[in-house]
């Protein structure tokens, strides 16, 4: 995705996974040929077609997108706190008496043992209703049927294929569908000296102030490797305990020029 400035006044064209002075560390205001900004507008106006589709027997919900959608079969209102919270509610107001299916896409990162589905307050065996990544619910829908999905959104460590040489020995963090990165403004200079532990105990925080307000941040114990002043030395770098902070990748470069990295060495 293209990282967008919080004021929408500029954006970053490069989909880089680390940011240093020589690789466009800030957001330019404009380009001679600017294709991404109008494409973003086109995306917003097309969201409805990405979120839903309909067949003769089934309504398909492809995204946990808060909205009200009007179809031949029903009007469906979706209340969603995703991706920051694991709760999505569908309110179905049927236009027809015949039964039809509502198929809800369940992202692959959601663990089935944490997924709870209720229909009008009654718990449903979600595992038996899922096929090819969709939760299928079929019944004679009324004028105010409510489907509620709840699930956990743990912080996950992601590893690259070993054929990706640049990412060997590194991990990235994700929570739900959101990729995270580490910026120098939170973690100090020399980002490459930071290390992620093999076993992490991450905590999340909803940011309430500044340009990142509304975003969920990740805090976790980590390490900083400190070496001697020599360019090369036989002295092994010393490890210092630190608290690391990660922000959503799309939000980087909103707080001035500083280093950024997605893939972090694992210690």
Task: Identify the residue ranges that each predicted region occupies.
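Short, cationic motifs built from Arg/Lys/His that form the positively charged side of catalytic pockets
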Residues: 6-7, 105, 139
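Single conserved hydrophobic/aromatic residue that forms the stacking wall/gate
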Residues: 1-13
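C-terminal beta-rich recognition modules with glycine/proline-rich loops and embedded aromatic residues
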Residues: 10, 14-94, 119, 123, ...
């Amino acid at each position: 995705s293209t990282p967008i400035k919080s004021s929408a006044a500029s954006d970053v064209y490069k989909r880089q996974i680390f940011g240093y002075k020589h690789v466009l560390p800030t957001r330019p205001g404009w380009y001679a040929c600017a294709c991404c900004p109008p494409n973003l507008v086109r995306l917003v106006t097309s969201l409805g077609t990405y979120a839903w589709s309909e067949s003769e027997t089934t309504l398909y919900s492809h995204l946990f997108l808060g909205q009200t959608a009007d179809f031949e079969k029903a009007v469906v209102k979706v209340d969603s706190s995703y991706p920051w919270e694991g709760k999505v509610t569908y309110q179905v107001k049927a236009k027809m008496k015949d039964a039809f299916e509502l198929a809800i896409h369940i992202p692959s990162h959601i663990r089935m043992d944490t997924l709870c589905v209720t229909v009008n307050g009654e718990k449903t065996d979600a595992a038996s209703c899922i096929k090819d990544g969709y939760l299928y619910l079929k019944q004679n829908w009324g004028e105010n049927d409510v489907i509620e999905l709840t699930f956990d959104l743990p912080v996950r460590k992601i590893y690259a294929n070993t054929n990706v040489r640049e990412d060997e020995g590194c991990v990235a963090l994700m929570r739900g569908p959101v990729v995270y990165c580490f910026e120098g403004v939170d973690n100090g200079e020399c980002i490459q000296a930071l290390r992620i532990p093999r076993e992490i105990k991450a905590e999340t925080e909803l940011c309430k102030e500044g340009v990142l307000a509304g975003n969920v941040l990740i805090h976790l114990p980590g390490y900083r490797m400190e070496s001697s002043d020599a360019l090369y030395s036989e002295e092994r770098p010393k490890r210092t305990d630190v608290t690391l902070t990660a922000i959503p990748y799309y939000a980087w470069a909103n707080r001035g020029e500083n280093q950024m990295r997605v893939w972090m060495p694992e210690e």
